[in-house]
């Protein structure tokens, strides 16, 4: 504030000049009265001016020059007019005796200073003889002085300024004339002087004033805020600084005030002064002339708008505004000048080009005249020469060049034409048009030229647009007559003149036409060139515009791809996290919580990328039975080497405990399949030890969820829900454990079987989520476990070949709900149709779409809507659905789940000669293949294909002459889709003769069918013997022990736990006796019976329970179903399970009723009551074993008794603990410390889980007993 306050004072008192001029003693003393320390403030002002690029020092020197000039000019009046001269150096450089040079408030400023310095209140105000409003000015100032008499001397000048500023602010609506005639004062931009607008106008009568203004027109530029203007003022006056300073030092005794007020450089802005107005003057010169200033009309606001005030100070608002306006006006003037110069240059260039073109045209015309003198044309003069432009357009020309001439000359304003004269060639007699224009024709006696009148239709009829510009015929013939009259005296001369006249006309016309043709050709070329250049420029501009657009599009595409990838990753991770959280918060009855692994690492698998190495090591183990331990260690090292930090191969392992139920058909909540592409790296897929279970959640109608599954069209053997064999070989680590146990402990088979059980427990969930990856590794366990068998080289090679053909079923119905298909639609660009399904629950509107993704093996599923119900309850009679899935072709699905099981069974039958004993662990097809009746008396035999069967003492479900459904030729089917959802239950009907009245359905041609018992038996076998295929070869060396132990302990399941035999084998003895042999005997008896069916051919029966429609005394096999219009329940089709029986039936559900329609006659006896009871036991046992054995991965046959189920769970617990011990034994060779810690945590988790499973098994046992009682 202090610096700014000092600048305002110094602008009035010019303290900067006082510091620069050492002779101004009086003014310096007087100024010291205002504020103490004023010199310091002046120094601050100098610094501020330097920062603002104001060169005050240079300006002061320039002003000193002006003072010297003024003194020289006014030597006669120095004593009388010191005050006036001292205050007028900025704008008027000389003073006359009349005091005409008064600039604004400068005449009052001396009075203010004298008032302050001398405190003389009665001093007269100076007069201005030339001003019209002296009285008003004097009164104005006197009134202000009277009001300021009581103020101290140091504050008077501030008060005056403040009051003047307020008066300006109050009078903002004055016009220009009022401002000129009033005493309102304006503010200078730089020094804050108040100038009276009336007294800016200066008379032109003083010659000295006119001479002194030319070199002093500095105006605003003298003290502008820009550096360029200030430097110009200093450079212009540097030559006079030395002399002027000396003069000032000698002559400043009487003129101290002159030097003090020299800095009145700038008072206004060029924007407020017209071109004929002068800028405010600083430097007087004798040769300068003073101009009359005229203010523009934009000075309505003398205060410069809302200028801020602080403590009575006058701001620089108006000064800045005026400066900005002046700069804008200067820039506009410069731009106008530049535009004018450019226009002039362009006009000059155009004129030069026109002149050059005219010269060229003249040259071309002369050359054409010389070249075409020999061509002669005969003119044909017509009566009507002048024609309108409309008639010209209607005329046609025969020559193409002439057409171009007429067309182009019409568009040209300079070259006007007339096509009125037509000429005919002597040779072709073609009509041609030529223009006459304003050319002159000359004729003479000697020069053979005829002069033609310059009068044309154009000159005569300038205002008529319809008349042409050609010459009239009358004028031409008048000249001809005149010439003819002149030459009548000389007939020879007359003849020559006529001939010369004709020749001259012909030559003239021809030269004109040729010249015009050339002009037109030149114009055409120029036009084409310009058009080409313009087209090229446009193309370049378009390319330049398209390049950034293309780049932007590429960048946007890249960003979108990245965003999509990120979104996919986020969605997958969110699904994984959400499902894990939900499972932890709300565990299913059949799915206990999964223990988390602290050693798990993201984006890695337990395998790394060494699946190929694992297979190679397994082959080495098969070839080198004595060195299995070394090979296994190599496998472990391979796992370890794939880790980036060299960590243990189990650092990323996530163990999943054995589950009670993993089948979507029997579980309350099933899991969706996590999509994995077959060609993707293992590092990008879900690790096999950490499968992700995504339970189907209730979905809102606005949202859709998609799941992708993988299927491949391969031959289908027998479609079973059992998928355990495919999942055994995911855990290559446990396979290595099996190798070690087999090689080190040939007599101990418990560890081998236990390890296999652990594989089941880990991989059941993988079976539903990573089926494709699991299916590619199906035969590793077979290779590993067959080390000790002498005949396993063939079986291993066969298994390796069959593993490529094994693919899992990506079941459409595996989401836990029941669906029916209501249509399909072809997809553009794809060979596979899109299938549409609807939930079968009554009132539920949920739909889903299933579609094959491109040429890949993935199916995408899209759900729409939200289920209004829970998961449907599973049926008690599972065989119906199992039979359907085993016999009916799936549309769009590949049911090759059990190919490996079949091949393994067939291949392993070679080793069943030494292993067929009462253990039930034979390698035949089905659990009874190669097994005795449980007493160890049967001898397993083999057919030519390696399929084992029994002699008379051992009954097998695969009889001679029968083909197993698993090996039947019907199982190779194409790829289609279906919805098999509704679950049928039994109906108790005692009728034997039943008919069918429904529509005929498509039949599946099957040469050889199996009995329903065979199917159920195979279901049990698939649950139990998948690991038996892997373990029986290991038991080859222990046949003696197995025979002895099993013969002694047929009924005691737990007596052989301490022996080398498997606990599972002991449990399987009872199962084989109860489930396999007796059923097979009953089935064999049915072939010899006679049919007892009587009655009509067609029978319809209505039942009221959901259980009675299948339990009618016969065994049925479901072969299809169909959706019914207007009903949420489908129609089911069944066929008698006997091979040769033609009886069929249809079942339609209507709310709580079931309508059964039978057709045909049975050609066999009904099954005995014992078989029916055993069949019920099969159903119950299959249901229980599917929930217990599959998820716990027992290698046992399904048990019908609840005690056997509990024993199986106990055995599996022991097996799991043994498997952990085996893992510890192997890993102690490599990373003992790490694996021990990890295994300890796993054991604790498994113990807790197994306790929970035991409780759940007890609950299941109670539920089964209650259901049996109800039945």
Curated annotation (Swiss-Prot):
The keyword Disulfide bond does not apply. Residues 1-12, 297-312, 488-515, 672-702, 957-966 have a biased composition (Polar residues). Signal peptide: none annotated. Residues 9-71, 320-372, 520-574, 766-786, 1013-1040 form a coiled coil. Residues 1-138, 204-312, 370-515, 578-650, 667-811, 890-1095, 1180-1210 are annotated as: Disordered. GO terms for cellular component: nucleus. It is found in: Nucleus. Disulfide bonds: none annotated. Probable transcription factor. Interacts specifically with the W box (5'-(T)TGAC[CT]-3'), a frequently occurring elicitor-responsive cis-acting element. Belongs to the WRKY group I family. This is Probable WRKY transcription factor protein 1. It comes from Dictyostelium discoideum.
